[in-house]
A protein has these predicted regions:
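Glycine-rich flavin
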Residues: 23-160
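Flavin-dependent oxidoreductase catalytic core characteristic
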Residues: 1-20, 140-141
Length: 160
């Protein structure tokens, strides 16, 4: 858990950032359908991609209550900011934290905490968001992977 005093300072700083930087950028995002790279880099610098990642892996080590308050503060701006962060944390980092091997955690959690952006491709045309009915496959082939299938609504796909 992040120290309570440090957390309150962080929330104050984040609130100012939302009001002074994120909300004013919304018009540009609506026009371009993209969060400006400068803002993504600022979000990295603020540590927003590693909120719940343990400190030993470079994250902030927030507990769930702190994370919810952080997301609530961030949510005063349009949802694209929160979505980018929560996919990284809620879908990808959580999978590594809760089900990854120690080697996977050591490789991926520091990168994700530093702001490497992950994507999560769940939704498919025939199965919606039913993970048990997914048809897409990934097969290791030589030095890479062969992906077969169709996805929709892939949050963070342009960044990952």
């Amino acid at each position: 858990m992040m120290d309570a005093d440090i957390f309150e300072q962080f929330i104050d700083q984040l609130g100012r950032y939302v009001r002074e930087r994120l909300i004013p950028a919304e018009k540009e995002i609506l026009e371009t359908d993209k969060i400006p790279d400068a803002i993504v880099n600022e979000m990295r610098d603020l540590g927003l991609f590693g909120l719940t990642i343990p400190e030993e892996f470079g994250g902030a080590g927030m507990n769930i209550t702190q994370y919810v308050r952080t997301i609530r503060t961030l949510s005063y701006a349009m949802p694209c900011y929160r979505s980018m962060i929560s996919i990284n944390i809620g879908m990808v980092c959580s999978a590594f934290k809760n089900g990854g091997t120690e080697a996977q955690k050591a490789e991926w959690l520091p990168r994700l905490a530093a702001g490497d952006i992950a994507s999560f491709g769940l939704t498919e045309p025939g199965s919606g968001s039913d993970s048990a009915a997914m048809q897409t496959s990934a097969v290791k082939s030589g030095n890479g992977w062969v992906l077969n299938g169709t996805k929709r609504y892939i949050t963070n796909a342009p960044y990952a």
